[in-house]
């Protein structure tokens, strides 16, 4: 039996499941969910002698660790599984490793509270004895993105078609979506995520929502069911925002070390930076907007982890940055991150107010070394379009309106580019 299946059940479903193992309903009604799960696992262990569990490792300062559950957003929970320092040292396990193994229920007479890992079966889908071969993420060679992530997947999804031409995203891209309030940022992130899931099922996609509203989290999970949506809502403490983001990053790094392509969509880098500003010890130096001088170090490490790896694999991070919120802190955070990315997509509030969606500022949006991602025809046509726009003095409103109309009349970008000739 797999413990993760139990974790997904509601309390009522657990009650029905418990009856199959002789746990009486009148008894189970008086116990908590964790105790009920432990009773089921003990009964299963007594009958079959083997219980399988899976989780993502978080190592602690004392040397031991716990397997955290995706269902609890990798935060501390009653379903966590203890893993001993000896096992961590023996296999060279790291935070973020996805571990599958045999576990046993806690011993009441020893005062144990958590399930314990008995035997490791796989680490990141591979045999644990092969772990000594894997490299460290920081030792891998970063290069410019040279393989485009094609976001075009439906004729009516105009935003992803425009991104494909104006600011293409490659494997290993470090991209910023610069967005004022109510400019269509969330819808755009959902379309980007759906395009990746549709066109690249082999890419592991994480959507990390920090300091978001709970209903936004539910909507994201329903709109992008194929992605792993991890969230720390605004009613959580800042240290939990930081813990969740670090766990997602470490899990992504472990996958990249195994030569997988990983994408993290972060909403938003601004709120993550705000959380670190409250968590880091005060340095005594306060910058513009109340930002501590040490606060942005870890958010920059998060964003800077995005890279295309020469040895194989890539980590792509697309993060939203909030501007024009009326907060000097938000503006300062954007200014600090502005030069660190190699792709920027700007959304315009004026276009959104005119109900022009996607409200993309084509003139301000671009990708560094886009020649490595675009075809020769795409590159020449887009350069000609930008040059024509500047020479004719065409304003942004008129340009995006024309582009949207032309794209609505064509089925794909290849047909749109042919239309530009006329």
What are these regions (language model features)?
Residues 175, 182-186, 191-422:
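P-loop NTPase catalytic core
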Residues 93, 108-177:
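P-loop NTP-binding catalytic core
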Residues 1-47:
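Basic helix-extension-helix modules of the SAP/HeH family
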Residues 5-6, 25-28, 108-112, 369-373:
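Short acidic, glycine/proline-enriched loop segments that cap or flank alpha-helices
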Residues 40, 55-61, 68-71, 85, ...:
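Flexible glycine-/small-residue-rich
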Residues 29-131:
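N-terminal "pre-motor" subdomain/linker immediately upstream of P-loop NTPase catalytic cores
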Residues 49-53, 158-162, 248-253, 302:
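Phosphate-interacting basic helix/loop segments used at nucleotide- and nucleic-acid interfaces
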């Amino acid at each position: 039996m797999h413990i993760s299946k139990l974790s997904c059940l509601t309390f009522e479903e657990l009650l029905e499941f418990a009856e199959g193992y002789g746990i009486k309903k009148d008894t189970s009604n008086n116990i908590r969910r964790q105790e009920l799960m432990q009773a089921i696992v003990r009964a299963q262990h007594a009958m079959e002698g083997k219980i399988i569990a899976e989780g993502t490792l978080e190592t602690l300062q004392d040397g031991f660790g716990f397997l955290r559950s995706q269902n609890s957003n990798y935060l501390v929970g009653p379903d966590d599984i203890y893993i001993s320092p000896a096992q961590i040292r023996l296999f060279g396990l790291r935070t973020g490793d996805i571990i599958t193994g045999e576990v046993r229920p806690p011993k009441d007479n020893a005062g144990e509270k958590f399930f314990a890992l008995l035997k490791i079966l796989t680490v990141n889908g591979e045999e644990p004895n092969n772990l000594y071969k894997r490299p460290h993420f920081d030792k891998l060679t970063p290069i410019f993105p040279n393989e485009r992530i094609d976001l075009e997947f439906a004729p009516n999804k105009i935003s992803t078609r425009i991104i494909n031409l104006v600011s293409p995203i490659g494997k290993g891209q470090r991209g910023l979506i610069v967005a004022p309030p109510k400019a269509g940022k969330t819808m755009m992130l959902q379309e980007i995520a759906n395009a990746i899931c549709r066109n690249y099922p082999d890419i592991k996609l994480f959507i990390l929502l920090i300091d978001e509203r709970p209903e936004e989290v539910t909507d994201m999970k329903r709109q992008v069911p194929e992605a792993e949506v991890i969230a720390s809502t605004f009613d959580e403490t800042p240290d939990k925002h930081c813990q969740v983001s670090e766990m997602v990053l470490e899990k992504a790094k472990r996958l990249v070390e195994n030569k997988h392509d990983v994408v993290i969509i972060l909403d938003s880098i601004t709120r993550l930076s705000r959380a670190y500003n409250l968590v880091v010890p005060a340095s005594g130096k306060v910058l513009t907007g109340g930002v501590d001088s040490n606060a942005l170090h870890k958010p920059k490490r998060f964003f800077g982890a995005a890279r295309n790896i020469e040895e194989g694999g890539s980590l792509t991070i697309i993060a939203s940055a909030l501007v024009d919120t009326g907060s000097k802190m938000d503006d300062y955070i954007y200014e600090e991150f502005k030069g660190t990315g190699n792709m920027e997509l700007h959304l315009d509030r004026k276009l959104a107010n005119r109900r022009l969606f996607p409200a993309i500022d084509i003139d301000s949006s671009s990708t560094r070394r886009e020649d490595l991602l675009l075809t020769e025809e795409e590159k020449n046509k887009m350069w000609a379009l930008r040059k024509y726009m500047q020479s004719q003095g065409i304003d942004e409103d008129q340009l995006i309106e024309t582009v949207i109309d032309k794209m609505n009349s064509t089925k794909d970008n290849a047909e749109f580019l042919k239309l530009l000739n006329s």
